[in-house]
Amino acid sequence: MPPSSLAEYLAKKYLTADPATDRPKKKRKKTKTVDTAGDGLIIADDDPPDLRTSATNFDNEDDEGPSLVTSVRSAEFRRAKKSNWRTVGGPATGSSNANDERDAADAILASAAAESAARRGEGEGGDDEAPAVVDEADADDGGELRMESGARAGLQTAEQTAAMVAAQERRKKAEAARHRERPAEAQETIYRDASGRIINVALKRAEARRAEQEKREKEEAAKEALMGDVQRAEREARRQQIQEARAMPLARTIEDDALNEELKAQQRWNDPAAGFLTKTKGPGVSVTGKPLYKGAFQPNRYGIRPGHRWDGVDRGNGFEKEWFAARNKKGRLEALDYQWQMDE
């Protein structure tokens, strides 16, 4: 039904009708297609639109105009399937380019295979520094990929899961066996100082032993320096007696001349009759071989006689005299105590 007859029908039946407008309708603008197949390179703007340009485009849009979708790639760009690269100095034919690309790909694959084989051969030859090439297809894995946790990727059956668990157990046992077979010195603790340098424990222990030995030697030397010549001679004589006692009989009788001479040489202040039986030798030389003083002298704790050059003057502080007086007083008190106990 034509528009005019429709308006008349509505006016006749319902008494309302929109008047026919003489305004021409807008037609959709058609974009001109540009053949880009013959052109070389197509440059597309990959930068995302910013807020300012988006707002400007939104204000300039016509509500009644056609909607343009900018995210869709052009048909010409999708239609361009062939490469527009040209070889300088040679014929730009499609068959030659395809052959060249195929040859280049074959050369790359051949070089990669040769490099992999050479690396694998070096690894079998015993080069520890060469990178190890590990195949993803393991005997226990069945050639399947595994996730980082060690489980197979994808769905598995109960048999596959049991086989995977058994393989993991075998790996753990093999690793534990390697750790047990490893020597103990390889597991020695590494000590480091504050700066991070490794400390040689054996060297430090040797230095500590050396320092301890030097300290002991210094102490012995200091103790030796405090001793006089007489003490050293007496110590040497005592050592000599111990050496001779090894060959000495256990029972020493009256026929032992050495023992008799030693007992006769002893002087006792409370045995005046001993002077009639034995002849005492006068002061001759000391233990060190030097002559002794022949006159009277103040007694001392060690019984050492003064040298022959002594002038008879006692230059001490009187300690020896007080020491003998204290010992005599203590002896008298003990004797009196014993007598008083007997009287009671």
Curated annotation (Swiss-Prot):
Question: Does the entry annotate any disulfide bonds, and if so which pairs?
Answer: none
What Gene Ontology cellular component terms go with this record? cytoplasm; Prp19 complex; U2-type spliceosomal complex
Question: Which subcellular locations apply to this protein?
Answer: Cytoplasm; Nucleus
Q: Tell me, what is an example of a GO biological process annotation in this record?
A: mRNA splicing, via spliceosome
Keywords of this protein's UniProt record, alphabetized? Coiled coil, Cytoplasm, mRNA processing, mRNA splicing, Nucleus, Spliceosome
In this chain, composition skew of type Basic and acidic residues spans 168-189, 211-223, 231-241
Which segments does the entry list as coiled coil?
A: 156-246
State where composition is biased (Low complexity). Answer: 106-116
Q: What is its main location?
A: cytoplasm
InterPro entries reported in the protein's UniProt record? Bud13, CWC26_splicing_factor
- Tree of life domain: Eukaryota
| Signal peptide start and end residues | none
Bias type Acidic residues, positions: 124-142
Region described as Disordered: 14-189, 211-242
Record keywords: Cytoplasm included? yes
What the record says about family reads: Belongs to the CWC26 family.
Query: Known PANTHER family for this protein?
Result: BUD13 HOMOLOG
Please give the subunit comment from the record: Associated with the spliceosome.
| Job of this protein | Involved in pre-mRNA splicing.
State what protein this is by name: Pre-mRNA-splicing factor cwc26
Please tell me the species this chain comes from. Answer: Aspergillus fumigatus (strain ATCC MYA-4609 / CBS 101355 / FGSC A1100 / Af293)
Its ancestry begins with: Eukaryota, Fungi, Dikarya, Ascomycota, Pezizomycotina
* Gene for this chain: cwc26
